[in-house]
Amino acid sequence: MYDSIRPYNTAERRRIQKASALYETHLENILDLLSARGISEETARYHHLGYIDNDPIPGHEDYNQCITIPYMYPVWGGPAEIRKMRFRCSLQHDCKTHNHPKYLTPAGDTGSIYNMAAMANPAAEIHICEGEFDSMILEQYGWSAVALPGATSWQTFWTKFFEGYDHIYIWSDPDPAGDKMAQTLQTALPQATHVPLTIGDVTDTYLQAGKTGLTQALDTVLQ
């Protein structure tokens, strides 16, 4: 089960995995930041989040002081394996005024589904979020969730990964881009339903209304 994940070759996979293990040793540096976003330490460790503390591997120099978000993929006959990572700026500033996006993706990466390891176990339903941290919050409270790296990142061939699910719930942001994402996914996935959010995205909803707010949003499409 693979999408456009990079890299494929063994040497580069091992390099990324070694880097992730290094960055994960600095997790304590960002626990307060993650907690402020609703992510528990247990969840952070489960997803192997890390931080680049002035020790980037070659090629990661531009991501110093970023949160590292490993992309883990299921492997037949073994545990899920880290194959790539994205980065999130951890500095308390307006990223736009500093001429860089909040989330950074290595050059040449065409985009991948986050947390495909969640799809390794047979289930009747799956939840799709707009953003990695949103999917972590849903998983934190018992919903199997994956994420797209942006509202416009859907790729047609991903459809095959979701064919076995009876129910798919789309948690896109409540804005025009999020609405377009929901429409795109509902066209591609007939069994998909859009979960309406009003407060903000999944993280905003959770921070303001807790799990109850998320449950109430989901209940509106389950009734």
Q: What is each residue range found by the language model?
A:
Residues 1-68, 72-74, 117-123, 188, ...:
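TOPRIM metal-binding catalytic domain and adjacent DNA-binding surface shared by DnaG-type primases
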Residues 39, 143, 190, 201:
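Short phosphate-binding/catalytic loops that engage adenosine nucleotides
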Residues 53-166, 181-182:
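Phosphate-handling DNA/RNA-contact segment within nucleic-acid enzymes
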Residues 149-154, 173-176, 197-200:
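Short, acidic/turn-prone active-site loops that include or flank metal/cofactor-
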Residues 165-179:
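A structural-propensity feature for long, helix-poor, extended segments
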Residues 180-190:
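Short, aromatic/basic amphipathic alpha-helical patches
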Residues 196-197, 207-223:
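Metal-dependent DNA phosphodiester-chemistry modules and their immediately adjacent helices/loops
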